[in-house]
Amino acid sequence: MLRGIDHIVIVVNDLEIAIADYGALGFTVVRGGRHPGLGTHNALIAFADGAYLELIAFIPPVAPTPHWWHSTLADGGGLADFCAVSDDMDAEVEAFRHAGAAIGAPFEMSRERPDGYRLVWTLAVTEDARRGITPFFIRDHTPRDERVPRDERVPRARTHRNGAAGARVLALAIGETEFDAARRIYEVALGRTGETVERADLGGAGVRFMIGPHELQLLAPTDPAGAIARRLRTRGGSPIELTLRTAGGWRGMLDAAGTHGARIVMA
């Protein structure tokens, strides 16, 4: 059973600058470490609801090996992917495969934190054009509490000056020709029908699903001049907007320059 969003991936060009900029926006940013063999390093923004944002960048010099994040960076960076947390990763992977998602074979990854602690987990990711539309899945081999910053290890790691308390809504931009297939994947895998949702502010409409405490919105364009249509023209189907839950803090859309291209709303 899916229990919610584990984390949301935000791809940035320069991790050090992103850490400073997100800190200036009122987030507590914790350095995550390096991913051996992948050529990336990250920093994390953890929330009280257990979800977190992963700021991730290629370590200079960027290797010429093709990676789908390069197109995201070429379009300014920002929201790129998301991971779902599950009671049983193997069962969820099979359910999504049965529904039509092209999820590849699980593989092991690791990250070495700045304090030397080595985190190990298994990932299963989508391998076709729906990557970023269907989630990837994770199974921890080391404790999740070591992977995700917590107050016991980093003082006030999950407390933010801007009042951010957790993920609320992740909106996904999906092309008209792909929308029905994407909706079917979720409906079959989750065993329920999505509820109709309209997002005039993004120029889209579609369906929404509750995944634990988090809402996923699958949106197709309704306005050729809207944000969803523009996103589809520049980078295809992908996460387009994240709404964060706040606890009495600042409300509204964060400056896109400070978020390195990620459309983030505080509500």
Predicted segments, located by residue:
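Glyoxalase I/VOC metalloenzyme domain signal
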Residues: 1-5, 11-30, 47-267
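Short, solvent-exposed beta-strand-to-loop segments that form ligand-recognition rims
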Residues: 34
